[in-house]
Amino acid sequence: MKGKHKIVVKNNRLHYEFEIKRNITIIKGDSATGKTTLINMIRQFANLGNASGIEIECDATCTVLEGNMWQMLLKNLSGNIIFIDEENQFIRQQEFAELVKVSDNYFVIITRENLYNLPYSV
């Protein structure tokens, strides 16, 4: 996957719109600014589709990576924009960094910590 990708995530109350240009993007910010809400909306859309009341506009599939099976899931995803919240401890692991580097997915990681093992933009 190459190039820029515009992402719009919205429901009847909230509207997120942004563009990512690199394969790894970090979203940082203060508490209670809507970062985790964005992840939750993407997760709800993935689980419930249109019944969730959420719309996602993007030229690639947006998905959330989380849980204990993250390695298997990541190895089987291709051409996706993958969102990861900071509560997932695996983002600090070297194995995660190595899988990201060989992946053709784009990654949007929400964290307040520096991830020194990943080359990313903020």
Region spans (language model):
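N-terminal pre-Walker A segment at the start of P-loop NTPase domains
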Residues: 1-16
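Hydrophobic anchor at the beta1->P-loop junction of P-loop NTPases
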Residues: 27
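Post-Walker A alpha-helix
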Residues: 38-40
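Post-Walker A helix-loop "phosphate-sensing" segment adjacent to the P-loop in P-loop NTPases
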Residues: 44-55
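Conserved P-loop NTPase "ATPase switch" module shared by AAA+ and STAND
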Residues: 70-94
